[in-house]
């Protein structure tokens, strides 16, 4: 039985990669990487996101200047069709991932009830 669970996990991994939503994220990501300005904007977003997460984990809040930078970056992203498509595709994929997470972790949740 213990080997079977790994087989199921590997099967799930392949099934996720085969999802049209996953394929769409890959497709849009490749388009972003092929465009230098869009790729740079995406990298700025990732860096800003990591910075904000780090601040929040340490209990800090973004300054007014940082909030302005975040808003400006958000506006640039909203104006970029490729990035907009990427985040929409990510959102569609995240629905599956949330459902899968809920299903997979249900037995562990039962243990703490």
Curated annotation (Swiss-Prot):
Listed SUPFAM superfamilies: YheA/YmcA-like
Q: Which domain of life is it from?
A: Bacteria
Pfam families the record matches: Com_YlbF
Per the record, the similarity remark reads: Belongs to the UPF0342 family.
- Entry protein name: UPF0342 protein SpyM3_0545
Q: Which species does the entry assign this protein to?
A: Streptococcus pyogenes serotype M3 (strain ATCC BAA-595 / MGAS315)
């Amino acid at each position: 039985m213990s080997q079977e669970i790994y087989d199921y996990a590997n099967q799930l991994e392949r099934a996720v990669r085969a999802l049209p939503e996953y394929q769409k994220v890959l497709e849009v990501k490749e388009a972003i990487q092929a465009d230098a300005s869009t790729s740079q904007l995406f990298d700025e977003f990732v860096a800003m996101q990591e910075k904000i997460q780090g601040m929040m984990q340490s209990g800090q809040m973004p300054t007014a200047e940082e909030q302005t930078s975040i808003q400006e970056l958000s506006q640039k992203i909203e104006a970029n069709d490729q990035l907009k498509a990427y985040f929409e595709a990510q959102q569609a994929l995240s629905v599956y991932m949330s459902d899968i997470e809920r299903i997979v972790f249900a037995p562990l949740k039962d243990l703490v009830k």
